[in-house]
Amino acid sequence: MSNLSVKDFKIVKLIPKIPDRLKHLAPTTLTSERCTFTIHNCSNAVSNAIRRTIMCELKVAYLHTEYEDIVTDDPFIIPEMIQKRMRMIPLLQNTPPDTKFSLDITNNTLDVLDVKTKSLIRGKPYFDETITILSLQPGKSLKLSARVASEYGYIPHYGMCALAFNATSICKDVTPSNMYDEAAESKSHFSDPRVWEITFNTNGTMPSKQIVTSACSNIIDRLKSVLSLLYTMAHNDNQYVLTIYGDSDTIGNLLIKTIDELYPDVEAATYSASAIERAVTLRVIYGDDINTLYKNAIEHLIETFKSIMEQI
């Protein structure tokens, strides 16, 4: 992958300007970042795979609270909402997995008490202290315990299981086509951008550079797992169908685009993602050794993402 290069890797700290009257709401532990970098000589499938993976396909640590571990005499508190709220608290990803958190509080005032995450912290802070967990009525009490768990962002109802937000992948070497301009030099269908600028924001739970390298490592592992599934391919003459359960458009698009680039004479190569489960199906019409085709495509992609990791 000597022609592939990563350039202009930039990280900007996103420090909010907060009025003095709102200083009590300012972040205390986490610092958000905006990361931008450019990949030269790669396909849109590669840049899009990184974008998709950093947004929702990395496993993310979060605070998990069991329903039974929430005990309160406040009738306005709904345990399910507290569970959801706890999941939404951004948590440092280097938090030891055996870390336990607990909260035991009574509102002895005459006003509604906003309970902040500061009340959860014991020792080293792993999240901001100024996030409101719940509002406790006068004279009421609450106890809860939480532990560190992890989940993927694409799983529904798991709140803050993401490391990057507002991620974009924009081509820099091809002018976007105007569909209404009949005099346009080239239609987007025929363009093949090879320079991609990737930009994303973080919530401060993991350094930007580590997010990118983790995404590349994640994609490499998923590609390697495809090699172990080649024996499951169904075929009819020279038509081959490979279904990858537990994966998404990310891998499907990567493989089909790479097959198309490495084997331009292949008769047909398409993929489709299931609408009801996490699975992607690849269909290829090829007259020679199909295993060699897949192995070459996967090895090429593995080298591509290793090269990106080394240059970050």
What function would you assign to each model-found segment?
Residues 1-312:
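Protein-protein interaction/assembly regions in multi-subunit complexes
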